[in-house]
Amino acid sequence: MKLRIRTMIWAAVLAVCLAGCSATGISGGTSDAGQVTTDFLEDTVFTVADMRVSLAEWYLYALPQAAEIENMYGTEIWDYPTDSTGQTMADALKEDIREQITYIKITGARAAELGLSLGEDDLFDINLQTEEYMSSLSEEQRLKYGITEDAVRQIYSDNVLAMKVYENLTLNIDTSIPDEQVRHMVLEYIMILKDYEDEDGEFVRYSDSELDSMRSDAEALLEQVLADSSITRLDEINDDRYSVVELVADLAELKEKLPGEIPEIAFSMRQDEITGVYETDDALFILDCVERTDETTTDKARIEIIEARQQALFEKKYGEWENEAVIKYNYKLWDSLGVR
């Protein structure tokens, strides 16, 4: 899948395939607390291996995210404590941004060893998006935060390379998935409960004779449905005694919502099959397989499973890279750094 660079820089950082990685507890490599701040250029926030993160780059990540949070919660949110240690919302976002940048830097740095680089189309898109982004900023914004075309271009380039690395490493992931794990069906069913609620709110079991009558009525209804060619779905039955429930689910979800052997029976039904009457301890069931395979939900589930496999594979590899990375902070700048 070709990455479409977003006009909002931070959205590219959180692109679907790379989203959530900072939330998994990535520590951002090995911190070198003994680094002397005079070793840094004045506007360097920190370095990841030999890669420098400038103040302008920091703000390009931070400002859009801070603005979105303020739009949602107001400007007072920054002093709000997020945990028992006294960490504030501003502290939490600062750490999250550091993790985002570190993640992109470490990942993109592996492009060369994998034989990956920016192609002509990538460079064209990067330059175009850089121009568009720069044109959206006022001169005051550029000067206040030191934002330059080079800084913007660097972020777009880093993100494209990181995406290329991700796709390269996860391209050949196993995509075979057992039917029972991924297939979603559309099931309609009538559930006839064996209990009723009395005036005191207590559930009372129907008498044996009443249950026999309910079974006979359900069997007669099923016979009527199967004999009437104009009825193709349970919800086409005109009988006020029964309500029809529709459920779109895989086998695991069927097991969560339906009792006994009903899930396995339903999941094995043929397309358009109406069958019953099945009995559990608490109810009678008539089942209708409206769609044996619901393509939309099945495809969505398949994609989610494959993406989870890709993410797990990539995070394992990233963990190895992270252990090799050394992060050095310009504490003179870092300690006073905000997100606005």
Give the location of each predicted region.
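Short, solvent-exposed beta-strand-terminating loops
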Residues: 55-72
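Surface-exposed, interaction-prone regions with an acidic/low-complexity signature
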Residues: 44-47, 67
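Short, compositionally stereotyped local motifs that mark structural "simplifiers"
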Residues: 11-15
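C-terminal motif of bacterial Sec signal peptides marking the signal peptidase cleavage site
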Residues: 16-20
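Mixed-charge, low-complexity intrinsically disordered segments
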Residues: 68-84
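Bacterial N-terminal signal peptides that target proteins for export
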Residues: 2-9
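Peptidyl-prolyl cis-trans isomerase
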Residues: 22-43, 50-53, 81-340
